[in-house]
Structure formats: structure tokens, C-alpha cells
């Protein structure tokens, strides 16, 4: 696996906020300035922050602070959209291991911005309230060591599968030993029949991904409802990496509803060098993954 280049900014984080902003037209791009104080006890520690569209679950920003500075500081987050509500998660890496650990090992908090209406400043209040935010992998097309809670490599195809879920969303990473398309299907009944299939390819730096379903043993078709929340992919040195997120239960009759803690049958396939989704696989296999439960 390759190491991901992380955008480094000076930013700050909090557990609550107050928003006093004017009203502008819906859908306009805005910038929010987070203004932070009272973080001196954490000076020198690392913070991670992400901003998520509360309605669609699309992550719109993810930032890393390598060292929290002493004194007051601020960060601009943009572009956000008017008329949109956001969930803001952050944690302070108190034990310095570079990864998220549930409180009280790390300090983690969550707050919401409801119906953002304009650019403006947010007064962030740092308090002692902690929340297990279950920090998820970044859907950026690069799978890094330890990014996902679970990982396996399928011996039949050579595809490495990475996964992590919360109560609502499943996040998947795939590393394929080829430059063609790669696919994964959940819940097959007979070969491809009944499977909820995601197939993706990266060509000239552009990811193409489709939500399909298996209608027969060897036939799959495009789903009329695309239920992928977010996706990204990269290709380098003869290897294709794809990451995506989707709802465990989308409500789409062509999707298989998944349940936390469930062991799910999985089909895997790839083409060694063709990005055409009509090209027959050069390798395929079946396996199973067990989703996170108790969440």
C-alpha cells in the first residue's frame, strides 16, 4: 500500500458552536471560519477534523492539524453550501499513535451546524463532553495501512478488501492487482444472481463506478437507482485502488439490506487490463466478510 499525502492546515476543533449569520440565496457557496480558544492543554498534540453533509452523508472536508498551537486560532472551511446542515466530527490524538481511539483514550466530539445561511464566524466552545465518533476511513482513492478496521486478501483474485461500518454506512476499499475494472458484489444467491454489485475502473485519472445488480447467474444490469454515497479511485504501478461508501440499507429493492454484525457473502472479480465493464473478468472468486456489530 502507498502512503497518502494528507492536507495539513492549522485548524481547531470544538464540542459546540454558535452561529449568527445573515440570509442569502439557497445553494450559494460559503466559507465558515471556526474560531477556537481554550485548547492550550492540548498544545503540541495532533487533531483530525471532518465535515459531513448531514442529509447525504457525503464528507465535504477532512483536515489534519499536526500540532495544536497555543492560544486562540482559527480555520476557514470552504466551500460549503447555504441551506445545508452539517455534522462536524473531530478528535484529539491524546496518546499520539496517529489513529482514532474511542474516548477516554482520545478526546472526541461531534456537533451540528443547522441550515447554514451565509459565510461567517463560528465561536467554538471547547468543553469536557466526549462522544465516540467512530472515525471512518477517508474516501479518497488511496488505501493506507491501518485505515480500515478489517482487511483480507482473496487468494483467488489477489484483490485486497478493506471494510468498516457504523450503524448506517459501509465503507469499502479495494486494491486490485491490475489496471482494468474491479468489482465486488454483496449477498449473491447463485453466482451473480441476487448480488448488489459495485464495479469500478480508473482511466486517465478518472474513476467510473456503477451500482449494478445480478439478475441471473452470469448477468448483471445497471441499477436504476444509484446508491453510492461517495467514491474515489487511483491507479499506479499496475495496481488499481478504489474506495466507496454506501448505505447498509438504501431502501432500493435492487439492493440487499445489510445489518451490523452480519456475515455477508461476497463475490469478487477483476479484469487484468480492460476498463470496459462489458469485458469478461480474467479472475473471479467468492468469499465472505463480517460487518461490525454492537454499534
Predicted regions and their residues:
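Bacterial N-terminal signal peptides
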Residues: 11-23
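Structural motif
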Residues: 33-44
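Beta-strand signatures of extracellular beta-sandwich domains
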Residues: 48-52, 87-91, 183-185
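Short, acidic Ser/Thr/Gly-rich low-complexity loop/linker segments typical of extracellular
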Residues: 55-74
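Short Pro-Gly-centered beta-turn/loop motif in secreted/extracellular proteins
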Residues: 74-87
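Structured interaction patches on ligand/partner-binding surfaces of diverse proteins
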Residues: 94-131
Amino acid at each position: 500500500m502507498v502512503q497518502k499525502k494528507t492536507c495539513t492546515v492549522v485548524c481547531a476543533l470544538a464540542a459546540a458552536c454558535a452561529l449568527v449569520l445573515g440570509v442569502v440565496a439557497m445553494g450559494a457557496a460559503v466559507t465558515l471560519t471556526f474560531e477556537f480558544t481554550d485548547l492550550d492543554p492540548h498544545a503540541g498534540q495532533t487533531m483530525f477534523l471532518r465535515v459531513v453533509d448531514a442529509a447525504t452523508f457525503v464528507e465535504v472536508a477532512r483536515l489534519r492539524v499536526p500540532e495544536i498551537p497555543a492560544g486562540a486560532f482559527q480555520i476557514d472551511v470552504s466551500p460549503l453550501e447555504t441551506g445545508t446542515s452539517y455534522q462536524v466530527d473531530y478528535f484529539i490524538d491524546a496518546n499520539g499513535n496517529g489513529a482514532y481511539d474511542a474516548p477516554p483514550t482520545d478526546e472526541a466530539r461531534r456537533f451540528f451546524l443547522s441550515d447554514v445561511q451565509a459565510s461567517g464566524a463560528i465561536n467554538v466552545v471547547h468543553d469536557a463532553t466526549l462522544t465516540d465518533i467512530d472515525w471512518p476511513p477517508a474516501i479518497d482513492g488511496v488505501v493506507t495501512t491501518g485505515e480500515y478496521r478489517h482487511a483480507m486478501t482473496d487468494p483467488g483474485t489477489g484483490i485486497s478488501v478493506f471494510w468498516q461500518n457504523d450503524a448506517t454506512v459501509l465503507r469499502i476499499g479495494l486494491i486490485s492487482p491490475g489496471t482494468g475494472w474491479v468489482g465486488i458484489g454483496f449477498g449473491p444467491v447463485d453466482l451473480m444472481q441476487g448480488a448488489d454489485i459495485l464495479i469500478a475502473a480508473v482511466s486517465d485519472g478518472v474513476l467510473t463506478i456503477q451500482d449494478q445488480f445480478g439478475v441471473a447467474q452470469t448477468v448483471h444490469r445497471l441499477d436504476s437507482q444509484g446508491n453510492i454515497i461517495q467514491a474515489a479511485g487511483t491507479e499506479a504501478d499496475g495496481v488499481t485502488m478504489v474506495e466507496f461508501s454506501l448505505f447498509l440499507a438504501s431502501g432500493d429493492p435492487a439492493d440487499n439490506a445489510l445489518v451490523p454484525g452480519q456475515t455477508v457473502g461476497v463475490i469478487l472479480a477483476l479484469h487484468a487490463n480492460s476498463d470496459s465493464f462489458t469485458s469478461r473478468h480474467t479472475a473471479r472468486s467468492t468469499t465472505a466478510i463480517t460487518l461490525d456489530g454492537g454499534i
